[in-house]
């Protein structure tokens, strides 16, 4: 009888083409997502070598990082480097026979939102992209992670990837989530608990009652930020919630094929007694809304809390690092989180740019006005998200409140397009990284949920969203 296996073990074993004595494996890759920033050199490598794309139907190209999100974006991209990258992706996709969603296509959006909503992402698959937040797709019970540009070329050419297997880690979130506490709060709390190196060398499986209670969109938020916890990838075993989400998607299996697929997908769960190299358990019942205060995703606290004092940290290097973070963020120890005033609000990104995220924000915003001291923007994660939001009248709620309503793209998550903070500006952001300069030179980023960001836009400072329900 074979030893019990984890979900990660099962997907890995199913995709090993060759295994060397030192543990190095050649893995078959089911899906390859491509965007404009990490693909130009890869396609050029194919061109020079005279190689075709091995499996065009298993490859999907989407423009997202550099595209403007303003209404006039079809007039062109002003930044020359960004424009060249976008034009190169369009040309490469055409030349190599890869399906491509341009900024003129309503299916266009952030690659990690587009994949799932098209049914390109399915349980049990191996999925890669030249982007660190590819872990998002693990919400479907897929093994998904980012790769470098040379690896992008390797996958384009061979539909395989050379890898060594990571260790297994289980993060179990028990209990029921309190009202107004979200998937974003769960993952920020997890990173606060394990640190940004806590998952290094591991693939994390998320489990427990709180995880199971999440919608697919919530699960994608959790898996999206696995990389911020240091892990290679994050996984959630598929269930009826997963199957219900998938079945109506354009590229999903249909009819009898779907029934056969679901029968297989139901086997994609960890066996009882499977070994994990590391286990972390959290209690969801005690989770509050979370706000980041520093320049690392592990720098988090409750909205009810205060900015911590780095002098309380024993380890010298970490203490020095946290003092640097406070200096960069312009904060002092002991400051109440709810006393921190903000200048900007960004609701969007591959972490929180889906329809449920916009609904949560609209619920807070409805009938209220953005503070006079705040500039706020909503950037739907895809054209289809934008279309659905407009059908529901969410755009009107945001516009009436004083938010900007933008076109889809990565936007202010990262300073690679025109949406960026000015030096010293402080932003309540639903994105995934608060590094120095992430949203612009000397930008100050606080990571929060969509509801928390929306409430901060109205109040002009952080507030406990639980008091607004």
Curated annotation (Swiss-Prot):
It comes from the Bacteria. One of its GO terms (molecular function) is 4 iron, 4 sulfur cluster binding. The keyword Lyase applies. Binds 1 [4Fe-4S] cluster per subunit. It is an enzyme of class 4 (lyase). Pathway: Amino-acid biosynthesis; L-leucine biosynthesis; L-leucine from 3-methyl-2-oxobutanoate: step 2/4. It catalyses: (2R,3S)-3-isopropylmalate = (2S)-2-isopropylmalate. One of its GO terms (biological process) is L-leucine biosynthetic process. It holds the Pfam family Aconitase. Gene3D superfamilies: Aconitase, domain 3. Keywords: 4Fe-4S, Amino-acid biosynthesis, Branched-chain amino acid biosynthesis, Iron, Iron-sulfur, Leucine biosynthesis, Lyase, Metal-binding. Its cofactor is [4Fe-4S] cluster. Its EC number is 4.2.1.33. [4Fe-4S] cluster binds at residues 350, 410, 413. Belongs to the aconitase/IPM isomerase family. LeuC type 1 subfamily. Heterodimer of LeuC and LeuD. Catalyzes the isomerization between 2-isopropylmalate and 3-isopropylmalate, via the formation of 2-isopropylmaleate. This is 3-isopropylmalate dehydratase large subunit. The lineage of its organism: Bacteria, Pseudomonadati, Pseudomonadota, Alphaproteobacteria, Hyphomicrobiales.
């Amino acid at each position: 009888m074979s030893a019990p296996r984890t979900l990660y073990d099962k997907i890995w074993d199913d995709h090993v083409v060759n295994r060397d004595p030192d543990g190095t494996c050649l893995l078959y890759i089911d899906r390859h997502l491509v965007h404009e920033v990490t693909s130009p050199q890869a396609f050029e490598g194919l061109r020079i070598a005279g190689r075709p794309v091995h499996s065009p139907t298993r490859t999907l190209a989407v423009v997202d990082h550099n595209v403007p999100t303003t209404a006039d974006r079809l007039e062109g991209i002003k930044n020359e480097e960004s424009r060249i990258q976008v034009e190169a992706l369009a040309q490469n996709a055409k030349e190599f026979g890869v399906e491509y969603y341009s900024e003129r296509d309503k299916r266009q959006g952030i690659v990690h939102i587009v994949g799932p909503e098209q049914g390109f992402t399915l349980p049990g698959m191996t999925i890669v992209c030249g982007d660190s937040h590819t872990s998002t797709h693990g919400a479907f019970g897929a093994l998904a992670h980012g790769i470098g540009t040379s690896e992008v070329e390797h996958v384009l050419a061979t539909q395989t990837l050379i890898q060594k297997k990571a260790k297994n880690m289980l993060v179990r979130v028990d209990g029921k989530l309190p009202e107004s506490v979200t998937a974003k709060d769960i993952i920020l709390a997890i990173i606060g608990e394990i640190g940004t190196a806590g998952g290094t060398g591991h693939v994390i499986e998320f489990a427990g009652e709180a995880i199971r209670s999440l919608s697919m969109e919530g699960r994608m938020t959790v898996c999206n930020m696995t990389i911020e916890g240091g892990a290679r990838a994050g996984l959630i075993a598929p269930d009826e919630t997963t199957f219900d989400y998938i079945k109506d998607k354009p590229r999903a299996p249909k009819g009898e094929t779907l029934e056969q697929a679901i029968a297989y997908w139901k086997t994609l769960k960890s066996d009882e007694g499977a070994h994990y190299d590391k286990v972390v358990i959290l209690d969801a019942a005690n989770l509050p809304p979370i706000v980041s205060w520093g320049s690392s995703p592990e720098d988090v606290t409750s909205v009810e809390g205060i900015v911590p004092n780095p002098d309380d940290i024993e380890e010298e290097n970490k203490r020095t690092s946290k003092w640097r973070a406070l200096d960069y963020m312009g904060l002092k120890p002991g400051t109440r989180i709810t006393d921190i005033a903000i200048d900007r609000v960004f609701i969007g990104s591959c972490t929180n740019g889906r329809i449920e995220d916009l609904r949560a924000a609209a619920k807070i915003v409805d009938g209220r006005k953005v503070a006079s001291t705040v500039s706020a923007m909503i950037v739907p994660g895809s054209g289809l998200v934008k279309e659905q939001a407009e059908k529901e009248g969410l755009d009107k709620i945001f516009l009436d409140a004083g938010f900007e309503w933008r076109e889809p793209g990565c936007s202010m998550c990262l300073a690679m397009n025109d949406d960026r903070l000015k030096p010293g500006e402080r932003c309540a952001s639903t994105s995934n990284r608060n590094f120095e300069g992430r949203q612009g030179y000397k930008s100050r980023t606080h990571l929060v949920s969509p509801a928390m960001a929306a409430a901060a836009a109205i109040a002009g400072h952080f507030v406990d969203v639980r008091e607004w329900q």
